């Protein structure tokens, strides 16, 4: 039978992507920093429990930092908007650190890490039956701020999204071969 998995920063995106007959839908718990799912799809996979025990964001959040990927001169925005480079760390504001991580482009790296673990440790893509892996990345405003407040962050998010997609393609090439992949990219239109 076909395997259907969904990995997303948010619960609704994961569940909607896996559908009613999926094998698993996983998202980052905004309170614990661990990947979670729902019992609707059956048992929680051993590989994700193992991942959570040593590699989930809650182990690395203190070292995570989001700075501009490119020199500040490569970002464009209105002159009256902030032109000072941003720097976000996620170990502060204890109650919101994972929510803020989820609304940063760093969450897309986390989605890729879990995706790679799924590809390595599950049976998805390992037989002649077509499987579905639905990946959701985040490309919205940081911490739900206005575009005016975070113009540089938005541009950086898109630059990092490009890198995340490139890493995903490299991963798929090495794990299952791109000749065996049908890739569809769409926007939800909401953040």
Question: Can you describe what each PLM-predicted range is?
Answer:
Residues 125-130, 176-180:
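Short helix-terminating capping/connector loops at secondary-structure junctions
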Residues 95-96, 149, 163, 176:
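N-terminal targeting/docking segments
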Residues 132-136, 184:
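Structural motif
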Residues 106, 110-114, 153-156, 160-167, ...:
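Extracytoplasmic/secreted proteins, especially bacterial periplasmic and envelope-associated proteins
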Residues 160-191:
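Metal-dependent active-site segment of extracytoplasmic phospho-/sulfohydrolases and closely related
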Residues 1-129, 138-145:
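His/Asp/Glu-rich, glycine-adjacent segments
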């Amino acid at each position: 039978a076909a395997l259907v998995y969904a990995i997303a920063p948010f619960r609704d995106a994961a569940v909607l992507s896996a559908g009613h007959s999926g094998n698993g839908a996983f998202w980052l718990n905004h309170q614990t920093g661990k990947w979670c799912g729902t019992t609707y799809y059956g048992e929680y996979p051993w590989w994700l429990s193992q991942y959570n025990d040593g590699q989930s964001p809650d182990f690395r959040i203190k070292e995570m930092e989001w700075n501009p990927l490119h020199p500040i001169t490569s970002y464009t925005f209105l002159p009256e908007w902030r032109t000072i480079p941003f720097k976000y760390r996620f170990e502060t504001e204890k109650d919101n650190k994972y929510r803020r991580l989820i609304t940063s482009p760093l969450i897309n790296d986390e989605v890729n890490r879990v995706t790679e673990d799924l590809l390595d440790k599950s049976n998805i893509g390992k037989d002649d039956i077509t499987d579905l892996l639905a990946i959701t990345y985040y490309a919205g405003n940081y911490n739900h701020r206005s575009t005016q407040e975070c113009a540089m962050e938005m541009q950086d998010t898109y630059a990092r999204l490009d890198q995340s997609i490139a890493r995903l393609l490299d991963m798929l090439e090495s794990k299952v071969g791109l000749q065996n992949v049908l890739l569809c990219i769409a926007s939800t239109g909401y953040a």
